[in-house]
């Protein structure tokens, strides 16, 4: 993407938005071309073990090719435990109390909120305060969202196709997000640690049973970094007739990967859906 020579104060540069994706053990960055929205530079950053994500991000601002180009605007995707509250029941003054009551070990984090108008909910999630400070030191205009939010938005639109119930299973960062929609609301949404495919199958079928879905007519959709996809699909087919894998790569998206290691991971589905949702 030919933006290396753009001045940070130029109108074109000011329209450029940097995406920062932060999970427990991974960092990556993406920038779309403002003149060609589906052309994206993507840089996975090698995280050092033994130091915090905040410390890794400080180093990245010195070493990353994309971060060194300087930006005014940043959209930060945060992977942390998320609590979904119906908009009609949300009281901002109580968000810290209900979040800490639901999730332990988050006392040193800042609690963030994001209204999800399409799902009629408010997402509460958290970010380490040191990490938040590192980000705020580098950008004038920052927006924080939960990492899975663009996937929710994209797959909610997908759920309107046909009349059958659809259970979505998004795999990322050794986690499994399981969710389904009913009209314009979440019917179910939860996250599981899923290092192993056998555990993932158990969680999916457990949720399926709890929701009382129809094994002959309702549908399971798998997407993301799916472990042992062939085995998992076959295992699910023993219990559910309709199991599908969604494509991880959108045909219209042109990705220029910036990385010293050619074998490094591909752009995550959640970042891709950000650009596709805005198309």
Regions found by a protein language model. Give the residues of each.
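Hydrophobic/aromatic-enriched cytosolic interaction surfaces used to assemble or bind macromolecules
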Residues: 1-279
């Amino acid at each position: 993407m030919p933006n290396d020579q753009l001045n940070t104060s130029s109108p074109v540069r000011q329209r450029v938005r940097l995406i920062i994706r932060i999970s427990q053990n991974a960092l990556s960055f993406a920038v779309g071309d403002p003149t060609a929205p589906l052309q994206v530079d993507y840089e996975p950053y090698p995280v050092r073990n033994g130091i915090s994500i905040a410390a890794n991000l400080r180093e990245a601002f010195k070493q990353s090719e994309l971060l060194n180009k300087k930006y005014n605007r940043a959209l930060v995707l945060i992977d942390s435990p998320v609590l979904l509250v119906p908009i009609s029941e949300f009281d901002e003054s109580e968000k810290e109390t209900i979040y800490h009551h639901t999730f332990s070990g988050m006392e040193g984090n800042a609690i963030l909120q994001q209204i999800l108008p399409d799902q009629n909910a408010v997402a509460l999630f958290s970010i380490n305060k040191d990490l938040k400070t590192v980000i705020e030191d580098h950008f004038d205009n920052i927006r924080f969202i939960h990492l899975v939010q663009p996937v929710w938005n994209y797959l909610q639109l997908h759920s309107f196709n046909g009349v059958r119930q659809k259970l979505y299973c998004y795999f990322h960062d050794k986690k499994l997000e399981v969710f389904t929609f009913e009209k314009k609301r979440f019917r179910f949404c939860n996250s599981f640690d899923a290092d192993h495919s056998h555990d993932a199958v158990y969680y999916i079928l457990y949720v399926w049973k709890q929701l009382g879905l129809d094994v002959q007519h309702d549908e399971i959709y798998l997407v993301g970094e799916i472990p042992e996809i062939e085995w998992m699909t076959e295992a699910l087919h023993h219990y559910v007739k309709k199991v599908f894998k969604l494509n991880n790569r959108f045909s219209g998206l042109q990705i220029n990967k910036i990385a010293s290691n050619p074998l490094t991971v591909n752009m995550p589905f959640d970042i891709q859906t950000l650009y596709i949702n805005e198309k």
